[in-house]
UniProtKB/Swiss-Prot annotation:
Biased composition annotated in UniProt, kind: Polar residues: 930-949, 1036-1046, 1070-1085
Protein name: Pleckstrin homology domain-containing family A member 5
Organism listed in the record: Homo sapiens
InterPro entries reported in the protein's UniProt record: PH-like_dom_sf, PH_domain, PKHA4-7_PH, WW_dom, WW_dom_sf
Superkingdom in the source lineage: Eukaryota
Name of the coding gene: PLEKHA5
Organism lineage string: Eukaryota, Metazoa, Chordata, Craniata, Vertebrata
Keywords annotated in UniProt: Acetylation, Cytoplasm, Isopeptide bond, Phosphoprotein, Repeat, Ubl conjugation
GO molecular function terms noted in the UniProt entry: phosphatidylinositol-3,5-bisphosphate binding; phosphatidylinositol-3-phosphate binding; phosphatidylinositol-4-phosphate binding; phosphatidylinositol-5-phosphate binding
Amino acid sequence: MAADLNLEWISLPRSWTYGITRGGRVFFINEEAKSTTWLHPVTGEAVVTGHRRQSTDLPTGWEEAYTFEGARYYINHNERKVTCKHPVTGQPSQDNCIFVVNEQTVATMTSEEKKERPISMINEASNYNVTSDYAVHPMSPVGRTSRASKKVHNFGKRSNSIKRNPNAPVVRRGWLYKQDSTGMKLWKKRWFVLSDLCLFYYRDEKEEGILGSILLPSFQIALLTSEDHINRKYAFKAAHPNMRTYYFCTDTGKEMELWMKAMLDAALVQTEPVKRVDKITSENAPTKETNNIPNHRVLIKPEIQNNQKNKEMSKIEEKKALEAEKYGFQKDGQDRPLTKINSVKLNSLPSEYESGSACPAQTVHYRPINLSSSENKIVNVSLADLRGGNRPNTGPLYTEADRVIQRTNSMQQLEQWIKIQKGRGHEEETRGVISYQTLPRNMPSHRAQIMARYPEGYRTLPRNSKTRPESICSVTPSTHDKTLGPGAEEKRRSMRDDTMWQLYEWQQRQFYNKQSTLPRHSTLSSPKTMVNISDQTMHSIPTSPSHGSIAAYQGYSPQRTYRSEVSSPIQRGDVTIDRRHRAHHPKHVYVPDRRSVPAGLTLQSVSPQSLQGKTLSQDEGRGTLYKYRPEEVDIDAKLSRLCEQDKVVHALEEKLQQLHKEKYTLEQALLSASQEIEMHADNPAAIQTVVLQRDDLQNGLLSTCRELSRATAELERAWREYDKLEYDVTVTRNQMQEQLDHLGEVQTESAGIQRAQIQKELWRIQDVMEGLSKHKQQRGTTEIGMIGSKPFSTVKYKNEGPDYRLYKSEPELTTVAEVDESNGEEKSEPVSEIETSVVKGSHFPVGVVPPRAKSPTPESSTIASYVTLRKTKKMMDLRTERPRSAVEQLCLAESTRPRMTVEEQMERIRRHQQACLREKKKGLNVIGASDQSPLQSPSNLRDNPFRTTQTRRRDDKELDTAIRENDVKPDHETPATEIVQLKETEPQNVDFSKELKKTENISYEMLFEPEPNGVNSVEMMDKERNKDKMPEDVTFSPQDETQTANHKPEEHPEENTKNSVDEQEETVISYESTPEVSRGNQTMAVKSLSPSPESSASPVPSTQPQLTEGSHFMCV
């Protein structure tokens, strides 16, 4: 039974300490014998951690673990064996039913044969097809296992999914949203079941047909990052470096936590793939002692598998292989990228175990290491040298009587390099870190020289590891001084990629930040000896399968802690550990929460669950070379604050724009309410509700104005802050540019590195600033709109097409959409440029409109739109009425003047004329169209006889009534005479206008009832235009009406009406040609008009007084 993870196992004998690997496993250190072991020195049991599981039915010293693919096997710590069969029942686990396990009986072998048995290995975990093939070939000279004859299954969907074991317990089931990997990447709700370390998903909870399966071991369960580009709130992912990334989403945060915990537990059964090893021969194998403490055996594993291809490599291929190793490539007879897993190699971590006959692994050989012997000088090569691309193997440096190791040509070359390096003395030994880079080693290196200050029997980190100028190693002062000594101020420089150097600094920070007061087990002056190669290999869980070691074997070669100068099993024996671990995973190796536990402190719970979520993928490791440089952090902070401020400014601008729109709406509603009150001034009971609404609108407008003022001030403050941050970034960029220019004059290696880093920072700043400049360019336009946001200002909307408020100026018009619906035809052509410029260029305060005598009438598209609005005037929303000025309201409060009604009639006539001209579709010029009106043509009269007759008949009654009330004799006066008469009779027009206004309202309500087909039909529009003619003509002037009535013969009613309409249209044309001229010019234009021949021949000769009347009223 393995020891429980409690305080009892911390009680160790004297000279024994413990340590914790990066993976979270606990190992024990014998300070006297300079050895390590997984087994507790008292109980003889291994400590159970998150990597292993302890079953109650296993004998003492046995442990349960999982392979890279998720197959279960058992570890015998007592005999150092691994097997896939249960030690009690002798049967394989039922969980392995989805794997093909080819176990071959191991024949009885002699002791010499056993010495040559290589370690077992797990083969072929390809990118998307996993085959668990535990073939055993004990006599294989090259340590190669057989492969399955075919792929067992492909991970994927439906038919390629893993077959679910119905007897396996279900860890968790429920609904999850999963994002599609292709197409629109939609989120689909699926029923997920987590069972037997595999995540199955179905269409519904019936669990009838498997839609897909995800084998969670080797997946990394983590929250989303900005690179994922997913905005879902409760979303997480299952990432794998060589397979697709699955994105999941839940409805609540609690569900997300539960699912992530369950999936993490399933994913953490392993961490890394294993590496293949060469066969190992041994002579003079020592006798094993209890717990293997005095003579701890360490597996020596070559870097590249010993096969025929590697043996036959040419010199060029050797060089290429070594350089590829420096870049983190695996060798399997050919170069391939780091992320490929064509062959999963067994790592050194299953190190110290031999496989039995029922074991899927092959035997392992060990050799003793006595660190007190004189051979320590050869064995303990500086760790600085081990970090280089030329990684030595210490095994061949022993005497031939100790060990005979067969290696590939590349490894022999490394051995030769080691001998040369050792012959150069300790001064050359101190240069090791320079080879700990990832660029080709044929580049020159500049090393600072310093004498070694360490005993030869210990492996250490580089002794002259002064940080680069742009990075600071945050060790404590006492440790820093004790380590570096007087010459430590010299700078270590590197011409190569800085990833590894940054990793070294990060290691130093994490291991020494809080440990200056912790006791050392010796008086050596080098606290940097706490790091060994296993520190780099013990990554958090899980990492990429291509990184070297699977979880099943990860803990077999524990690392030593900073507290001890002894070498861990891997460091002492396996000096050819896959350098990719430390070369491309600095973030995996030293994360702040993953620290070893000091001897004098209480053990803290180290769970792989807590470690796994903090790791990053291998691709991310290369992109943060100077992540912890203070200047870079400062740049990141400035850019982040600038981006956040940009968001704030954008939000405030949107809020301000919304407030402007609300303010304008309230203004329109308030003015419409005022107009409604004005129109019903003689009926206080009818306007009581409108008065209340007006009060509410006034309060709302005041509140909106206050909020608008606050928002404007807040936006200004936000822009000032934005400008300040932008200025800071600009200053920083200029300083960096100056620094870059200065470094361009210096031709040194460190200057080249700094130039590259500064250039990266400049590019990053440029990218951010260009992205923000798009919003900044719109600032000027937005501010103009805010400053000119008067009720009738159109500056703010100048880029939004025609100002929609122009359409709202029509009386009782609510929205543009209503005008469109009522018109039933396209918008009218723009009115004259003079009118448009007057409206758009005038800015008046709330509730004040331009005086009517000096500006054109409110613009509307067509006469049809006006008619539609007039016919539903009583039922229109109050805030859509046409606003009136304060002067108008004051005048109306005193008396109702007929000229107001006349002006409205003139407006309708003008709009009617525009509609007729547009209908004619001949592009007639309105200013010069006084020769003949469109309605004067015989074709128009013939086309519309029904409308003309209908209009005449409906208005005969009203005209007769008006004539009886006004006993004015008709005369054929000239326009000048008519003006004089109009001035004399103006006071009498008040009563008549009131009566006429009532008659007009009745007529409009009768004439403009909606047709069944709606107001959009062409027929309806024509009818409405004709309906408008007669009231406009008749109500134009009381005298004109009298003249028309007295001269109207019974036998020619249609001619009278037509002539009246035609001549009044001529009047409108004349008026429209001079909208802004003086009264004198208008009178001259009126006098210049003469009746056409048709009008002269007509029995009704005079509508000229109407012409003069209209001119008079529009000029006053």
